[in-house]
Swiss-Prot record:
It holds the Pfam family Ribosomal_S7. InterPro entries: Ribosomal_uS7, Ribosomal_uS7_bac/org-type, Ribosomal_uS7_CS, Ribosomal_uS7_dom, Ribosomal_uS7_dom_sf. The keyword Ribosomal protein applies. GO terms for molecular function: rRNA binding; structural constituent of ribosome; tRNA binding. Keywords: Ribonucleoprotein, Ribosomal protein, RNA-binding, rRNA-binding, tRNA-binding. One of its GO terms (biological process) is translation. One of the primary rRNA binding proteins, it binds directly to 16S rRNA where it nucleates assembly of the head domain of the 30S subunit. Is located at the subunit interface close to the decoding center, probably blocks exit of the E-site tRNA. The keyword Phosphoprotein does not apply. This is Small ribosomal subunit protein uS7. One of its GO terms (cellular component) is small ribosomal subunit. The gene is rpsG. It comes from Laribacter hongkongensis (strain HLHK9). Part of the 30S ribosomal subunit. Contacts proteins S9 and S11.
Amino acid sequence: MPRRREVPKRDVLPDPKFGSVELSKFMNVVMIDGKKAVAERIVYGALAQVEKKTGKNPIEVFSTAIANAKPVVEVKSRRVGGANYQVPVEVRPARRLALAMRWLREAARKRGEKSMDLRLAGELLDAAEGRGGAMKKRDEVHRMAEANKAFSHFRF
């Protein structure tokens, strides 16, 4: 138990262009070394590409991609009697969002397109359609949880 008082969570302000808090959080995930302007340029560029390629509302595509990439369960290590068990646990909503955003970013970075906004646009489109690196990561985490279902009685 911490001795100090609990520090309140800081609210993230919605982004100026679309008024979305989720998008603002994603910009913070993409940001490197505090360069917010660069992160904004990348994310807005990616959304412009998405709109150009699909003709759909880019925020809807973004929301669908995030929703598809969110994990439902994950495994946590639990030591019981000298053995480590991978125990499947449900993921809290805030962590679901954070993991989905992180996985989208990492999958985009590993892609082959020239610039980051093109990579991110490609990954968002793939995730919205249920494929791509972020979806592969989510399925891998779900498979691990499914394989270790027998240890679910060791819940935390």
